[in-house]
Amino acid sequence: TPEEVQAHLDHGDPYVIRQKMPLVGETTFYDVLHGSVTIPNTELEDQVLLKRDGMPTYNFANVIDDHLMRVSHIIRGTEFITSTPKHVLLYEAFGWEPPVFVHLAPVMGRDDATGKTSKLSKRHGATSFDDLVKMGYPAAAIVNYVALLGWSPKTTNQEVFSMDELIEAFSIEGLSKSPAVFDYDKLGWMSGEYFKAM
């Protein structure tokens, strides 16, 4: 009740500030790869905007920062699709136009012992750019290989690209909804192509 709330405030009890989610209906947003995505509002929890210490939560600060920085595209993993309606509702509450959303499939690694794939992690080997460079792979070959993970140029079957060619050929619409598997043999082949060209 309002009286109980006031009593807690008068007592100095810590509290959070939440955004009240709609109790009925659905929230729909458009994703470049997945099309129209609709989540029932009953699946959305009232999200915390300000923590007990008065600091904003990541999701709250992120939406504000993206708006103030004029971010045009939010490109992130598919695991964030279910939280996107909360962001959309925040944009609506502020009266702001949401950015373009693109949710990418994860890059997978293959377990050599079982042949099964799972989200790429350190157990699959080197996972950072620097680790791969230290292993002897040319930086340009790594960039070229990673660019082709989950993306296919629409106008060519070319596999070896200069940076300028990648920039020219890239389009979000060429991204795949399906997870790509990181393949060290393919990276080795790509590196060989770069070494031959030196």
Protein language model regions, located:
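Active-site cores that bind ATP or allylic diphosphates and position pyrophosphate for catalysis
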Residues: T1-H103, M108-L120, S128, P153
